Amino acid sequence: MTRRRSALASWLLLSLLGVAASLEVSESPGSVQVARGQTAVLPCAFSTSAALLNLNVIWMVIPLSNANQPEQVILYQGGQMFDGALRFHGRVGFTGTMPATNVSIFINNTQLSDTGTYQCLVNNLPDRGGRNIGVTGLTVLVPPSAPNCQIQGSQDIGSDVILLCSSEEGIPRPTYLWEKLDNTLKLPPTATQDQVQGTVTIRNISALSSGLYQCVASNAIGTSTCLLDLQVISPQPRSVGVIAGAVGTGAVLIVICLALTSGAFFYWRSKNKEEEEEEIPNEIREDDLPPKCSSAKAFHTEISSSENNTLTSSNTYNSRYWNNNPKPHKNTESFNHFSDLRQSFSGNAVIPSIYANGNHLVLGPHKTLVVTANRGSSPQVMPRNNGSVSRKPWSQHTHSYTVSQMTLERIGAVPVMVPAQSRAGSLV
């Protein structure tokens, strides 16, 4: 810090003394450009009439990044050289042997931060007068870094897309040139290019817009490129595929629904058919009234019970169930059984009798009960032409029995009227 202050004091002193001396610093070329990493030479020379015994040279820099903070680069005073700012250590030196009237310096391995305005201040006592400051600009050039290529926007056919290209580094600022890598190396007719911003706008893209595009970033000392593949998407095939898939799915669903409906219908039909086949057609038949007994004959009361007699009305069949068949002849046989009791009741005694005529009870002059019983086999079942079942009557045997009142009273019988019944047991 003390050395820096002494250098600044010497620079001010030399400046004041230079007003009266004849020392003159020659004009510099104004600006020096160098690529990053290379060596830059900053020229500075002066003329004097005095010996170089008291020569003082100071190099200062005003950085481009921070103009308010000047920095010392190198100092020559009293026959010795002193380093300036830390970032210049080992990289800066005088091009010639000091002391000399050529006080140019070099900077090795230049960096981007080395860009700025350099000042050369020369004093050589006792010379006075002239201009003792030289100014030289240094620009460290940086080639463009590898640019980044992007696509902005939809790539569907008919859309607008923007091709972007930019480099992070590059001094001077690079320019960008887009081209399509085909036979013509030209952009589509609908493309608009901005070389400063590095953009290309392609409107209403089509299948012809597809291809490989190249962006070239360049400046004074170098170039760099990037590639971008633009593939325009045609929506028609995708829409056709979606429609085809939807139609196929709908068709499958319809087929499944039809199959389920048909299966349910056939199942219902077969089930209903089985139920119809299981049903036997029934016909309601009317029974005719049983025939009335024309005569009542007394029978012996002690009749064997093994005859299996039943109280029933005569079974008849309606003539409408017969197809032009004559009405069968009923063969009824009456058996008259007389017992000793019959003789005991004969004479003048009047015995009340009860007659069974099928519908009602009639009191007669003899007190005896006449029971009419039918015994016969069931009618034969015969099929008819219309699918119904008819029955063919068999011959029946009718037996009449007479029971005396005394016998009925002895067994505790009560007179009742039995209505006529059909073959099935229902009342007529």
UniProtKB/Swiss-Prot annotation:
Q: Name one GO cellular component term.
A: glutamatergic synapse
Residues on Extracellular side: 23-239
UniProt main location, coarse: membrane
Looking up InterPro entries in the UniProt record yields:
Ig-like_dom, Ig-like_dom_sf, Ig-like_fold, Ig_sub, Ig_sub2, Ig_V-set, IGSF11
Return one Gene Ontology term, BP aspect.
regulation of synaptic plasticity
Q: What does this protein do?
A: Functions as a cell adhesion molecule through homophilic interaction. Stimulates cell growth.
What are the Ig-like C2-type domain coordinates in residue numbering?
A: 144-234
* Modified sites of kind Omega-N-methylarginine: R375
Task: Provide the GO MF annotations for this entry.
Answer: ionotropic glutamate receptor binding
**What are the record keywords, sorted?**
Cell adhesion, Cell membrane, Disulfide bond, Glycoprotein, Growth regulation, Immunoglobulin domain, Membrane, Methylation, Receptor, Repeat, Signal, Transmembrane, Transmembrane helix
Tell me the ranges covered by the Ig-like V-type domain, including all copies.
23-136
Bilayer topology reads:
Single-pass type I membrane protein
What post-translational events are described?
N-glycosylated.
Q: Which residues lie on this side of the membrane: Cytoplasmic?
A: 261-428
Cellular location(s): Cell membrane
Instruction: State the organism of origin.
Output: Rattus norvegicus
> What SMART domains does its record include?
IG, IGc2
Q: Where is the signal peptide?
A: 1-22
Report the record's disulfide bonds.
C44-C120, C165-C215
Which positions, given as ranges, span the membrane? 240-260
Kindly provide the name given to this protein in its UniProt entry: Immunoglobulin superfamily member 11
Q: Which residues are glycosylated?
A: N102
